[in-house]
Design a protein with these regions (language model features):
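Transmembrane beta-barrel strands of outer-membrane/channel proteins
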Residues: 48-54, 96-100, 169-173, 230-234, ...
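Signature for the C-terminal beta-barrel architecture of outer-membrane proteins
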Residues: 196-322, 329-332, 336-343, 350, ...
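Outer-membrane beta-barrel "beta-signal"
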Residues: 135-147, 375, 444-456
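Outer membrane beta-barrel transmembrane domains
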Residues: 257-259, 274-312, 333, 340, ...
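Hydrophobic, lipid-facing positions within transmembrane beta-strands of outer-membrane proteins
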Residues: 42, 78-82, 132-138, 167, ...
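Short loop/turn motifs that connect adjacent beta-strands in outer-membrane beta-barrel proteins
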Residues: 32-42, 55-57, 85-94, 143-166, ...
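Residue-level signature of outer-membrane beta-barrel architecture
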Residues: 86-88, 98, 140-142, 173, ...
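Surface-exposed coil loops of outer-membrane beta-barrel proteins
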Residues: 111-128, 132, 147-257, 393-404
Length: 456
């Protein structure tokens, strides 16, 4: 880890110098329309989420090691998180998030789907509560004028203000999704959509450990209606593993995102384009399929992929993320991404192409301002190389039914979140999954969920 920290230290200094050189300082004569409150010096916020799910029995003429169990089953996750922060000095903040998590997935293991049904299941490690460090990072802001906007206190955000034009640097232990791929309607599995394809791109194989976090940096440049983000993060030492690969100069995940705000029919919206590129020691499906053909048999582990992890390889993808308000209480969103699909999944899930479109409406429309209703349609696909591997009997990290009658995985999710007081919500959720793990011979699967969420 020392190599990572040394590298990050040099990156921090270099980017700080670049930002200061390129920055346009706020003019002393620039008018300030109001007096702004003193920035909040410290923060301590907490959240608790419990998510219980069950699915009924479904059609399944055959199963293998990584098939979703066709019998009636249930699962749960529980997390308690502290969001602690302090202002080190002007415009510099430090945040620390310890978390306790526990839970058990369907089938006793995280298998059988491309679009998994619970966004918190990667943090669960069984029935014993596990304490771990989720985040530890520094955020530095360089204000660039253009007027100011208020910042309300929130998780990992001290109350205060920021310039509309600014440069923001985040360095340390955090999630790529903390900075990249924002969306007002579909981002948080604790309060919004639960399915993995509902809160980020299903095909976004972003670098992270098995819990979804890593070490690295992200730089944001915000000016007027534009925002540009770039960053580099560490990935797992082995695909979908918990141990981090600290060689961030050799194995890494890079991302670049461009965002433009707009107004359509008098309502705000945003359009984003995100490109990512990962370098890691992973197997190509071509090599893994060749190994299967040379070593025929029935496998219960991703043996072929392990044997084919012979060299470093490049993974990449590009996606579009759009959101558009339809009024003060509702909005729609769209995400679409395509990955290259030539190599095994590195750190997220078994999806090479993803599409999600949805609608969210706030309860103020019917007199319950703290309620919300959401609907999303999702479609996941895999590459022809991954199809051939699975058809040959291959087992990957999350999926593998022994054979494959390929069809895109299709998912619809509907939730209603009922506000209980100001800071608690009870959410009822239904998901229907056709062609689970891209296999038309199995399913459909109906999943019913109840989620409890409180903030303190």
């Amino acid at each position: 880890m020392s190599a990572v920290l040394i590298c990050l230290r040099w990156v921090l200094w270099l980017l700080a110098v670049v930002a200061l050189v390129l920055a346009r300082p706020t003019s002393a004569a620039e008018p300030q329309p109001q007096l702004w409150p003193e920035p909040e010096p410290n923060t301590a916020r907490f959240q608790l989420t419990y998510n219980w799910q069950r699915h009924g029995s479904f059609a399944s003429p055959y199963t293998a090691a990584n098939s979703l169990s066709a019998a009636r089953d249930k699962m749960y996750t529980a997390t308690v998180t502290a969001f602690l922060g302090t202002r080190l000095w002007q415009n510099t903040e430090l945040y620390f998030n310890p978390e306790v998590a526990q839970g058990v997935p369907f089938s006793g293991s995280l298998v059988g789907l491309g679009g998994f049904t619970n966004g918190e299941i990667t943090r669960a490690a069984g029935t014993t509560p596990t304490l771990y460090r989720q985040r530890l990072f520094v955020r530095q802001t360089w204000h660039q004028g253009g007027g100011r906007q208020a910042l309300e206190a929130d998780d990992n955000q001290l109350a205060g203000w920021q310039d509309n034009n600014r440069v923001v640097l985040t360095v340390g232990n955090f999630s790529t999704l903390d900075v990249f791929d924002p969306n007002s309607y579909a981002k948080d599995p604790r309060t919004q959509f639960m399915n993995w394809g509902g809160w980020t791109y299903g095909a976004y194989d972003y670098a992270a450990d098995s819990r979804g976090f890593g070490w690295g940096f992200a730089l944001e440049w915000v000016r007027d209606i534009w925002a540009l983000r770039l960053g580099r993060m560490t990935g797992p030492l082995e695909p979908n593993g918990l141990k981090i690969d600290s060689a961030i100069g050799r194995h890494y995940g890079d991302q670049l995102e461009l965002e433009r705000s707009h107004t359509l029919a008098g309502q705000p919206g945003k359009l984003r384009v995100l490109a990512w590129r990962t370098r890691a020691r992973v197997a190509s499906f071509q090599d893994a399929t060749a190994w299967l053909q040379a070593n025929p048999g029935s496998y219960t582990q991703p043996t072929a992929l392990i044997q084919a992890r012979n060299t470093d390889k490049i993974k990449y993808g590009i996606g579009i993320n759009a959101e558009q308000a339809l009024g003060s209480n509702s909005g729609v969103f769209l995400r679409a991404m395509r990955g290259d699909g030539r190599t095994e999944t590195h750190a997220f899930t078994e999806v090479d192409g993803s599409l999600a479109a949805g609608w969210v409406v706030q309860g103020a429309s019917w007199g319950r301002g703290n309620d919300s209703l959401g609907v999303v349609l999702m479609r996941n696909t895999i590459s022809s190389e991954r199809q051939r591997f699975l058809s040959a009997g291959g087992i990957s990290f999350f999926i593998g039914d022994g054979k494959l009658n390929y069809r895109p995985e299709q998912i619809v999710e509907v939730y209603y979140s009922l506000g209980v007081g100001r800071r608690s919500w009870i959410t009822a959720d239904v998901q229907r999954l056709r062609n689970p793990a891209y296999n038309a011979d199995r399913g459909p699967v109906n999943v019913y969920a109840l989620r409890l969420h409180s903030e303190f």
